[in-house]
């Protein structure tokens, strides 16, 4: 249960006065974060302190993983921030996991079948435990990396490891040889293509 200044967020049943729960929710990429993936820490410290003083929740909402969001908010641990990660599939706060919305197990074989038929896609399988990339997608991932640096106008680093690169965006990414090795039930399939593949 999210906590602000020692007071649990009331459930709808507990909130008999119908007093609205106040919160500020922000997206990260292109909104809260600058182009270099940073933010004004001192200014945010002042804002967060003021929000907390008035009983207003600060919510980070993003398609990023929970681990990545915690990296962005390093230094603000135990400040009662609520995280809505993986496009809403994973919700947590400083006390831990609050809600997880995963794919139905009976749907996964068909999802895997469809993805196996699309070799041009870079695929990251995200669960509440970790993120996973298939080893047989290494060539595809490398093409996407080259495209990324080309679009950014940056030189491609020498001896780049596709899995190390993926870990920049999906911390703790693990190599797997088949979908059967995914730990946990998927909550998101992140699909990547090169800009040339976008019609």
Briefly describe each language-model feature range.
Residues 1-8:
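Short, Lys/Arg-enriched N-terminal segments with co-localized hydrophobic residues
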Residues 26, 90-92, 180-184:
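Short, basic/glycine-rich phosphate-binding loops at helix/coil junctions
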Residues 20-37:
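Asp-based phosphoryl-transfer active-site loop
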Residues 121, 126-199:
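Conserved acidic, metal-coordinating active-site core of Asp-based
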Residues 9-22:
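Extreme N-terminus of proteins, especially the signal/transit-peptide cleavage junction
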Residues 39, 44-151:
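Active-site phosphate-binding/coordination module
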Residues 33-35, 98-99, 188:
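Short, contiguous strand/loop micro-motifs
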């Amino acid at each position: 249960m999210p906590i602000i200044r020692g007071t649990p967020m009331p459930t709808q049943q507990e909130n008999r006065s119908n007093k609205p729960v106040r919160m500020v929710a922000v997206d990260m990429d292109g909104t809260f974060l600058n182009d270099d993936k940073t933010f004004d820490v001192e200014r945010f410290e002042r804002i967060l302190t003021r929000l907390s003083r008035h009983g207003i929740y600060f919510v980070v909402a993003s398609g990023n993983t929970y681990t990545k969001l915690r990296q962005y908010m390093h230094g603000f641990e135990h400040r009662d921030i609520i995280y809505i990660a993986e496009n809403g599939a994973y919700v947590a706060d400083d006390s831990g996991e609050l809600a997880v919305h995963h794919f139905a197990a009976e749907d996964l074989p068909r999802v895997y079948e469809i993805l196996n038929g699309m070799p041009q896609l870079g695929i990251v399988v995200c669960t509440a435990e970790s993120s996973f990339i298939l080893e047989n997608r290494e060539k595809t991932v490398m093409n996407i990396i080259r495209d990324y640096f080309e679009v950014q106008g940056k030189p491609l680093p020498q001896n780049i490891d596709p899995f190390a690169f993926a870990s920049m965006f999906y911390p703790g990414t693990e190599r797997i040889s088949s979908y059967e090795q995914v730990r946990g039930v998927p909550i998101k399939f992140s699909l990547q293509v090169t800009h040339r593949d976008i019609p």
